[in-house]
């Protein structure tokens, strides 16, 4: 979607006080790809800093014929926010959880670079920093995931570059 221009819809209020932001990419007459961001009311503590993201394929059955899975390529570069690079780097990694497990797995905290291929289902994948995380949570799990990070050089104002290729 990097090379395409989406059309923004007006910001709308939801019944629970959240706001929705919708971006559409026309594909054919009456068919479009829709990105829907739901920004929750921060007066509810359990939803502070929570942004929901849904992808909708509207009237796209002819364009998506025979598709049973979608490949997601997710990447993010994190900036150094704290004074001490080494300390912040130790708390920055990729985390994930297997279905039915209570423990959380991760790629390691202070490695220069690391990657892992997971061929079984995972509930979610998160790019984790010391105080904040970005998580991809699929409604019916992620079936495969290739996860990796590279650590930036101290003094570059960056911390890590994350990537995750997942099948949903």
Region spans (language model):
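Soluble non-transmembrane domains of integral membrane proteins
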Residues: 1-168
């Amino acid at each position: 979607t990097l090379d395409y221009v989406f059309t923004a819809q007006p910001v709308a209020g939801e019944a629970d006080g959240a706001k929705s932001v919708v971006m559409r990419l026309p594909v054919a007459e009456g068919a479009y790809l829709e990105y829907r961001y739901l920004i929750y009311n921060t007066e509810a503590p359990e939803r502070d800093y929570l942004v929901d993201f849904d992808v909708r394929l509207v009237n796209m059955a002819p364009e998506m014929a025979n598709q049973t899975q979608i490949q997601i390529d997710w990447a993010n570069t994190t900036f150094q926010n704290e004074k001490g690079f080494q300390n912040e780097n130790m708390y920055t990694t990729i985390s994930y959880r297997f279905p039915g497990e209570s423990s959380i797995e991760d790629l390691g905290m202070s490695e220069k670079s690391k990657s892992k291929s997971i061929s079984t289902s995972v509930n979610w994948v998160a790019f984790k920093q010391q105080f904040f995380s970005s998580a991809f949570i699929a409604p019916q799990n992620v079936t495969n995931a290739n996860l990796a990070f590279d650590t930036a050089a101290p003094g570059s104002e960056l911390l890590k570059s994350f990537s995750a290729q997942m099948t949903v």
